[in-house]
Amino acid sequence: MSEIADKVKKIVVEHLGVEESKVTPEASFIDDLGADSLDTVELVMAFEEAFSVEIPEDAAEKIATVKDAIDYIEKQKAA
């Protein structure tokens, strides 16, 4: 697992209070991890701060799973 993936996983565990084992790439923040819309906004803000990236609202709406977040951040960091 990449450094970005590890950090995303840690942020999700801290913000949603879920077990680390439940935070898989395919896990949906809302359906699998019990997040609500406010939680997802807070996660996006945490990702922006932790990785020094900007995630516009239209992109944030498409980030539904752990893998979506990792992929988006990796693309931004590579740009």
UniProtKB/Swiss-Prot annotation:
Annotated Gene Ontology cellular components are:
cytosol; membrane
Q: Which PROSITE patterns match?
A: CARRIER, PHOSPHOPANTETHEINE
Query: Which ranges carry the Carrier domain?
Result: 2-77
Q: Where in the cell is it found?
A: Cytoplasm
Q: Which domain of life is it from?
A: Bacteria
Q: Which InterPro entries match?
A: ACP, ACP-like_sf, PP-bd_ACP, Ppantetheine_attach_site
Record's comment on post-translational modification: 4'-phosphopantetheine is transferred from CoA to a specific serine of apo-ACP by AcpS. This modification is essential for activity because fatty acids are bound in thioester linkage to the sulfhydryl of the prosthetic group.
The record's keywords, sorted A to Z, are: Cytoplasm, Fatty acid biosynthesis, Fatty acid metabolism, Lipid biosynthesis, Lipid metabolism, Phosphopantetheine, Phosphoprotein
Q: Which residues carry this modification: O-(pantetheine 4'-phosphoryl)serine?
A: S37
The main place the protein resides is cytoplasm
One of its GO biological process terms is: lipid A biosynthetic process
As one GO molecular function, the record gives:
acyl binding
Q: In which pathway does it act?
A: Lipid metabolism; fatty acid biosynthesis
Keyword match Zinc: no
Q: What does this protein do, in the record's words? A: Carrier of the growing fatty acid chain in fatty acid biosynthesis.
> Which HAMAP family does the annotation name?
Acyl_carrier
Its family remark reads: Belongs to the acyl carrier protein (ACP) family.
Supply the name of the protein.
Acyl carrier protein
- Species, as recorded: Gluconacetobacter diazotrophicus (strain ATCC 49037 / DSM 5601 / CCUG 37298 / CIP 103539 / LMG 7603 / PAl5)
Q: What is the lineage of its organism?
A: Bacteria, Pseudomonadati, Pseudomonadota, Alphaproteobacteria, Acetobacterales
From the UniProt record, report the name of the gene that encodes this protein.
acpP
